[in-house]
């Protein structure tokens, strides 16, 4: 009985391998560079001043880059 089950499992894996399953292209794991860029962007920091193009002087201590001093 176990050998028949093993043969059936082997045939199923040969006919439909697990790598043939299509992956969702919208997964963030598929694009790690974009995900990292979005996470560390200083423009998205709440202390970033878009008009001046830099962070407020006190936010340098809060790891907001670039600082204008």
Swiss-Prot record:
Gene Ontology MF terms in the entry: ion channel inhibitor activity; sodium channel regulator activity; toxin activity
Keyword Metal-binding belongs to the record: no
InterPro entries reported for this sequence: Conotoxin (IPR004214)
UniProt entry tagged with the keyword Electron transport: no
Subcellular location field: Secreted
Signal peptide limits: 1-20
UniProt cross-references to Pfam families, sorted A to Z: Conotoxin
Protein name, entry field: Mu-conotoxin-like Am3.3
Organism field: Conus amadis (Amadis cone)
Lineage: Eukaryota, Metazoa, Spiralia, Lophotrochozoa, Mollusca
